Curated annotation (Swiss-Prot):
Belongs to the MnmG family. Its main location: cytoplasm. The keyword Transmembrane does not apply. NAD(+) binds at residues 270-284. Keywords: Cytoplasm, FAD, Flavoprotein, NAD, tRNA processing. NAD-binding protein involved in the addition of a carboxymethylaminomethyl (cmnm) group at the wobble position (U34) of certain tRNAs, forming tRNA-cmnm(5)s(2)U34. SUPFAM superfamilies: FAD/NAD(P)-binding domain. The lineage of its organism: Bacteria, Pseudomonadati, Pseudomonadota, Alphaproteobacteria, Hyphomicrobiales. One of its GO terms (molecular function) is flavin adenine dinucleotide binding. This is tRNA uridine 5-carboxymethylaminomethyl modification enzyme MnmG. FAD binds at residues 11-16. One of its GO terms (cellular component) is cytosol. Pfam families: GIDA (PF01134), GIDA_C_1st (PF21680), SAM_GIDA_C (PF13932). Its cofactor is FAD.
Length: 623
């Protein structure tokens, strides 16, 4: 018997869960195909969510009513705002997670999602009909029909684990790889590449000398990821910090030839910003130590994740390395670290909707696109699932651009520039950082999510109430004003120019905060502290945001110049190099062309002039 759905999502990891939930929220009948329901929401590597750049993505997923932020709040056992001493634009919320609580909360959310059915099984082949996707076939022979398919296979595509001189096929420890899907992609015509990632050994926390390491508490009170989380109720823990030693490095150098990375056993690229401890020692030979963060994996689990010493050295070498690190001299290793290689698709095969250019109805999200990290996967999954549902229902696709959010920055980087190593999000990748802050993700995206039909009624009502409160607070702050002399009586030093300044303008001064303006106007104390914080940040950035708005307008002007179906050989003045690069990349807009390597401002000017001339000629011909 053949089942039928609007959308099928393959894989129950972070990308798959968001894709399936986003599709279902729009009303599309959605199937989530995964090996076992019990592995949904599993944290394959580090037990943490968020971080610099990554925390922005989590907040953006939340703004579109995605799952990750709320699940991370439910399972979070230590919350920290990274870069707190810096400006709000580059702060990154992060949470240490209890693996069991996180997975349980995700499974409950998936189970409770309307229009979503979980199917235990392994997708083995993509069904194609009439040049577009038509469904999937499972390894047990079952066929499932659909108008759209989202593939979110993580490290499972022809996954191969490496541990010292040993290697074996696996998607992750104790789970089989997905072999049939890789062959299916190749039959369709996709050229698959190989990437590598790794994980550290796991430790028995009861055998760690915690007195010998620095302890790191979380923020008090903890700040949630989701705007819908009133407060964190899960018990909070501390993490530990220790360092490798010269003895550690000597041991690694002595055995580096046994690492698959250096023996030639692994030839694929790994994540630049999350290198193995072997890589750190070889690449940074002048360092006498590297930080190791000891991260508990749960409230009732003694397992500790030593963040910073990912390795694929033989098991006995890993144990010897641990014994050279302060606090870990007598530690017991519950599972060795390892490296894993897996297939990926060149993300330049994708449209900004995350639909493949080669096959209509086929969408990809997560590590299959060359990214690394739970948060990057979740954001892609949401966009892919949303667009798959829109495609299945005959709706117009949605594209998030670089001025919309970090999810737009990431997707544009992937589909325009491609990757040579696993892609990780950082705040430095975004041109419009002042606009794209973690604290204003809902202000930027939730209204759009409501219009797209992926935001539930409860969040929509909360959002409208919050925006109304913020607008009222801003109007109130702008209606109150003081002269410099009046401000001086309250201890505030302003330029004695006689000009009255509103409470909102006063908040733009670096040395003036909400407490100072509330001391002048006590009625402001009635404003909700969360709204007051938003208002102060908006005031601090107001001048800069107005300047950035002009940059965004220019960016969107270039994005509006569409390059589809253009014959570059007919564009006079383009160099052969520019013409070749444009023909190969097939950018969708002049803005996207400008982000390609080797495309000069002069070439962009020629393209823009050509498009405008063509538009004038079409207008004249139709007159």
């Amino acid at each position: 018997m053949t089942a039928s759905f609007d959308v099928i999502v393959i894989g129950g990891g972070h990308a798959g869960c968001e894709a399936a939930a986003a599709s279902a929220r729009t009303g599309a009948r959605t199937a989530l195909v995964t090996h076992r329901f019990a592995t949904i929401g599993a944290m394959s590597c580090n037990p943490a969510i968020g971080g610099l750049g990554k925390g922005h993505l989590v907040r953006e997923v939340d703004a579109l009513d995605g799952l990750m932020a709320r699940i991370a709040d439910a399972g979070g056992i230590q919350f920290r705002m990274l870069n707190r001493r810096k400006g709000p634009a580059v702060r990154g919320p992060r949470a240490q997670e209890d693996r069991k609580l996180y997975a349980a909360a995700m499974q409950a959310a998936i189970r409770e999602t309307a229009n979503l059915e979980v199917i235990d099984g392994e997708a083995d082949d993509l069904i194609v009909s009439g040049g577009r996707i038509a469904g999937v076939r499972l390894t047990d022979g079952r066929r499932i029909k659909s108008a759209a398919v989202v593939v979110t296979t993580g490290t499972f595509l022809r996954g191969l684990i490496h541990l010292g001189e040993k290697s074996w096929p696996a998607g992750r420890v104790d789970e089989a790889p997905a072999l049939g899907l890789s062959a299916s992609f190749e039959r369709i015509g996709f050229a698959l590449g190989r990437l590598k990632t790794g994980t550290p050994p796991r430790l028995d926390g009861t055998t760690i000398d915690w007195a010998a390491v620095e302890m790191q508490p979380g923020d008090d009170p903890p700040e949630p990821f989701s705007v819908l989380t009133a407060r964190i109720t899960t018990p909070q823990i501390q993490c530990g910090i220790t360092r490798t030693t010269p003895a550690t490095h000597d041991l690694i150098r002595t055995n580096v030839h046994r690492s698959p990375i250096y023996s030639g056993q692994i030839t694929s690229s790994g994540p630049r910003y999350c290198p193995s401890i072997e890589d750190k020692v070889v690449r940074f030979g002048d360092r006498d130590g590297h930080q190791v963060f000891l991260e508990p994996e749960g409230l009732d689990d003694a397992t500790v994740y030593p963040n910073g010493i990912s390795t694929s050295l033989p098991e006995e070498v890993q144990l010897a390395i641990l014994a050279t690190i302060p606090g870990l001299e007598n530690v017991k290793m519950t599972r060795p670290g390892y490296a894993i290689e897996y297939d990926h698709v060149d993300p330049r095969e994708l449209e900004p909707t995350l639909q493949t250019r080669r096959m209509r109805g086929l969408f990809l999200a997560g590590q299959i696109n060359g990214t690394t990290g739970y948060e990057e996967a979740a954001a892609q999954g949401l966009v892919a699932g949303l667009n798959a549902a829109l495609a299945a229902g005959g709706g117009d696709p949605v594209v998030f651009d670089r001025a919309d959010g970090y999810l737009g920055v990431m997707i544009d980087d992937l589909v325009t520039r491609g990757i040579t190593e696993p892609y990780r999000m950082f705040t430095s990748r975004a041109e419009y950082r002042l606009t794209l802050r973690a604290d204003n993700a809902d202000q930027r995206l939730t209204d759009r999510g409501i219009a797209l039909g992926c935001v539930g009624a409860g969040r929509a009502a909360y959002h409208r109430a919050k925006m109304a409160a913020l607008q009222a607070a801003k109007q109130g702050a702008m209606s109150l004003s003081v002269t410099p002399n009046e401000a001086a009586r309250h201890g505030l030093s302003l330029n004695r120019d006689g000009h009255r300044r509103s409470a909102f303008e006063l908040l733009s001064y670096p040395e003036i905060g909400w407490r100072e303006v509330a001391a002048i106007w006590p009625e402001l104390s009635a404003i909700d502290p969360a709204i007051a914080e938003h208002l102060e940040i908006d005031a601090k950035y107001d001048v800069y945001l107005k300047r950035q708005a002009a940059d965004v307008e220019a960016f969107r002007r270039d994005e509006g110049l569409v390059l589809t179906e253009i014959d570059y050989s007919a564009v006079p003045g383009l160099s052969n190099e520019a013409r070749n690069r444009l023909e190969k990349a097939q950018p969708l807009t002049v803005g996207q062309a400008g982000r390609l390597d080797g495309i000069t401002p002069a070439a962009l000017g020629i393209l823009a002039a050509y498009l405008r001339r063509e538009a004038r000629q079409r207008t004249a011909a139709s007159a």
